[in-house]
Amino acid sequence: MWALAFVLAKIGIFAGVIAGAGGVLALGGYHNGSRAAHTRLLSYSLLGAFIGFHSSLAPVLIQAGQINDAGVMGMFDSDLVLLLRGTPVWESAAFRGAGFALSALLTLSLLRTLRAQRKPPDSVFYRLAFIGQALALGLVAYGFTLSGHVSVLDAWLRAALAFHVAAMAIWLGMLLPLRWCCDDVESGGLGELMRRFGRLGIGLVAALASSGVFMLLNLIDIIELFTTEYGRLILFKLGAFVGLLAIAALNKLRHVPVLHLPGGSRALARSIDRELVVAMALLLVTAVVTTLFGPATH
């Protein structure tokens, strides 16, 4: 029961950071420019912040319930919860929760500003959105380095994990806004938008791959990829990542060049739908492997 609860909380944190980052960053031109599109992106980000905030606090309550051994009601033993102050699970929850709270306050402020203005948002609106979300994402990413087996390792590995989380959140968080663009943006503008994301995606994939390989080489011996449960799950995760790259390459090389043809945008939309399914599988495996398993040497 408690293991499943921890996994579900981790999935909620992943979903929150992905939606929170993707919704705000997609304001940078990945929409049709309408007020409705701005509202939808900010609502997407706000939903992510809401889910992420509550999922970030959940591990503290789950830990208390696990220690108390009194069922679900044991999670709400305030004295025991307060005794967890200063532990890795508490500190991680504090930074993640602060990041998601900042993201929620930011998006609420942006939504209020958007509704109060009759004219399109100016550069200050976008600058505030991007800077605020970058700070929020930094807090959440740092929170990941404070718990788990990486938390006891050197600063370079913890920095690589934070970098990995941030790149993952941006890349996967942009997929749903891109899917919306297939329905809302005319084919000429959609092609330019997708080419621009393709250039951004190269940098994000490079960041994900380099940080992931660095952590992998420092956390596990290569032979353990084939001889341990943790290693085999890592291989499955790598396979899902390669699958995402294959779909992204297919989008770039096959679907984007023919967007001007009849049915071009629908074909791209279906491809992004498949990408979203693979991304969900990747996140599920990541939640399981980072919550329930660990490298044998750490």
Predicted regions located by residue number:
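Polytopic transmembrane helical bundles with strong interfacial aromatic enrichment
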Residues: M1-H298
